[in-house]
Regions:
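An amphipathic, aromatic/His-enriched active-site/gating alpha helix that lines ligand/cofactor pockets
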Residues: 55-81
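Short alpha-helix boundary/capping motifs
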Residues: 20, 54-55
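Short S/T/G/P-rich N-terminal loop/turn motif that feeds into the first structured element of a domain
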Residues: 1-32, 36-38, 43-47, 80-85
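Basic side chains
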Residues: 48-49, 74
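Short hydrophobic/aromatic beta-strand micro-patches
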Residues: 9, 52-54
Length: 85
């Protein structure tokens, strides 16, 4: 399944409680659409976040986020390029 990248920008910076609340709302919406969380990166200043999901396409992820009322900057498909390649 392809990787989908979700970008966020937080102003003011996101708190741990806010990130947890987003995940609680989002998880059921992702599961119902066959979207699997892979990993997440949060900037040290807590103003940016990138999440990686396995999903059929970007529209499925966007729909899940909108259903959960979780804002995002953009969603785009990606492929992994690693040092092992």
């Amino acid at each position: 399944m392809p990787h989908m990248i979700v970008e966020y920008v937080f102003d003011p910076p996101a708190t741990e409680e806010e990130l947890d609340a987003m995940a609680e709302r989002l998880d059921p919406c992702l599961e119902g659409r066959d979207v699997r969380f892979v990993q997440s990166f949060v900037s040290l200043d807590r103003r940016r976040r990138i999440c990686v999901f396995d999903a059929a396409d970007a529209d499925v992820v966007r729909t899940a986020y909108r259903s959960a009322n979780v804002t995002f900057e953009r969603v785009w498909p990606a492929e992994l390029i690693s040092a092992d390649d």
